[in-house]
Amino acid sequence: CVFAETLTNPSLVVTDLELFAERAHAHGVPLIVDNTFPTPVNCRPFEFGADIATHSTTKYMDGHATQIGGVIVDSGHFDWANGKFPMLTQPDESYHGIVYTEAFGKAAYITKARVHLMRDIGAQAAPMNAFLLNLGLETLALRMQRHCENALAVAKYLENNPKVSWVNYPCLPTNPYHER
């Protein structure tokens, strides 16, 4: 698997997801992208070839850091039966010999992730955490718009301040990643 962040933390490098996806797929492996920083509001990695997107829900999605969590989202486009993932193409004795690629097709990975994580480590939100996350998701689009507007205003102010030697913000036209 190839792992990347859409927007790296803390350096704010904007990853060329199309290039990463092309290279990963040329080798028969998926591109898994941490999309925590931009959220799905500002970047939809599947549109650039990513196969799996992950998000820390504790940050922007929650909005208040009141719960701890994360999500895994599968695009449903990757061929998990290509011979490189025996844990998906061979019988899983812990689930009565099921072969995930045969039973679930392109949803093999996300199904295995879900059933194994819930069974083995209980990776499931408590009801209150789910409620708090849902509250944050209801205002995510509006909050992200405001975050971006405010960040750009601050970056422009700092860029024009003679006491500041440089500003690294991808939305500034002077930033090398501005076009991505």
What function would you assign to each model-found segment?
Residues C1-N160, N168:
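Conserved PLP-enzyme active-site core in the AAT-like
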Residues K156-R180:
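A compositional/biophysical signature of low hydrophobicity enriched in polar/charged and small residues
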